[in-house]
């Protein structure tokens, strides 16, 4: 058994040698579309499976068969001693686990420090567990989906239902002695993009508007703290408080996960003890032909969907 990372990297170019596998020079799409998609005209990073023509137009992995470019380097072999272990224990090595590990590593939470997580989907859930594993003393998680809040609380997260409070920032400051969290992770993902409709949804507290969530993250971090962004931003964000970041000396780290960089850290934890609870993340399992249903219930947050696993 092998696990295929979501980004495609060669393993030998300049950026791969720097362990920045999501920036692989060999697989980067240098076409006009990728260049046009960059506000700075610098194009995009490494090709990604199933991520449109902007990232290489490589077909995605939700299929019966998958062609794997750069297969000499990318696929991660499941250890032979893990024979008989369920696929789900290793499945998340393709994206969820390394993305979460990188988010926590970039957050640079002090020993026994406090981490805030905005968005308790799969990345937020796993980030909380990894943060505790790596020595965080306290994790505060923000969302409004009951099933997400319940699952996070099971793993020791102090949860905040943003639909039930007037001002998340003020509550987080109150919970942290007025200073704010040592670090925050924006794991909201591509749920909103700051449009008028999204703003209305945020105003009515139906969902967490992405730009608003980012500002709440920043406003809830202590001076000298760190913001780690794992939620994907496809373009400019309105009202980005750069001046406040400068004044508060908040460091910002972000980017697509460099999957292979973190595999050696994660693999020893995928044992029968399952300290990260990888087998507890899946809420739905369905055949491949039901993928549209899986996407729908996840996008609409129906039927308690947190993570849907498709089986061919």
Short names for language-model regions:
Residues 136, 188-274, 312:
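Glycine-rich phosphate-binding loop and adjacent beta-alpha segment
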Residues 105-110, 176-177, 219:
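Glycine-rich helix-loop-beta junction characteristic of Rossmann-like nucleotide cofactor-binding loops
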Residues 165, 179, 260-312:
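C-terminal hydrophobic helical "lid"/dimerization subdomain
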Residues 3-6, 231:
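Conserved "cap/hinge" positions at secondary-structure junctions
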Residues 117-120, 125, 132-216:
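Adenosine-nucleotide cofactor-binding segment
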Residues 1-3, 115, 227:
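Generic structural signal for buried aliphatic residues
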